[in-house]
Amino acid sequence: CGGRVVKNVPGYDLDRLAGGSRGTLGVILEVTLRLLPTESDRCGVLAGFPTVAGAVDAAMRLRDSYPTLHAITILPRTLLPHPTEEPVALLVSLRGEPEYTAAMKLDLLRELPEGAFPCADPIPMSSAWDEVLRGGLTIAALPSRCGALLAEILTAREPGFPYVLDILSGCMRLAPPELTRFEDEERTLAPLLSRHEAYGERGGDPTFHARRARVFPEQKWDGLSLMNSIAKTLDPAGIPMRGRRDF
């Protein structure tokens, strides 16, 4: 997009397409919708890492080795009600029949560092999680770049800065300490996002789009709006279906 060629990729995830294309959409020639059965079991595996880079490396390996994983999320230990010993947590979410999830948990525990353990999913989060969801700045990048981007963003911030990174889509949520400083935050991040070919957006703010146009004048957003419209058509009830709409 933006001078690039949009390739045909069978089985591409709607959420990944919205993030991976930087919000700009090519011409859709054909759409195939595959409906998957409702999962009978929901669970996950949680592991701790000393650095974001280590967690991202492990997450990328899992993504490539186990394409049926429901979600792979990286977040600071401070967002967990029962923190891991390491400062960075990696949560792998599983959905499916009990036989499948039981076998996957064993495989993941062998793949992840010692100290990883099975957990419920979704797991209870601390109050800081609500702060991220209410006022967070959403940033999307190619999954292969989001680890380096997040590491750079965190370099200039205090330990425990709230963030949530979804490895499968390349989308992350940040919660600046002072939500009134979003415009300064966006201007500070603009060169960094441009270097990593990423974009940022804050929802629930009627003035955000006008400010975004000043901060990121080169970005085009009509594609993201179109993808959101498609998602709303497929899921009018607003039920979270990450990784469940295959195109």
Where do the model's predicted regions map?
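Short amphipathic beta-strand starts and helix->beta connectors
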Residues: 27-32, 65-80, 123-125, 155-162, ...
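FAD-binding subdomain of flavoenzyme oxidoreductases
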Residues: 1-68, 73
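Solvent-exposed residues in well-ordered beta-strands and their adjoining turns
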Residues: 32-36, 48-50, 95-97, 142-144, ...
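A conserved active-site cap/scaffold subdomain adjacent to cofactor or substrate pockets
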Residues: 42-44, 48-51, 57-118
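Active-site-proximal beta-alpha loop/turn segments in soluble metabolic enzymes
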Residues: 35-45, 85-91, 169-173, 208-213
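Short gly/pro-enriched beta-turn/loop segments at secondary-structure junctions
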Residues: 12, 39-42, 67, 84-89, ...
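Conserved glycine-rich FAD pyrophosphate-binding loop
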Residues: 110-247
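Hydrophobic side chains in well-ordered alpha-helices
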Residues: 1, 55-62, 101-105, 149-153, ...
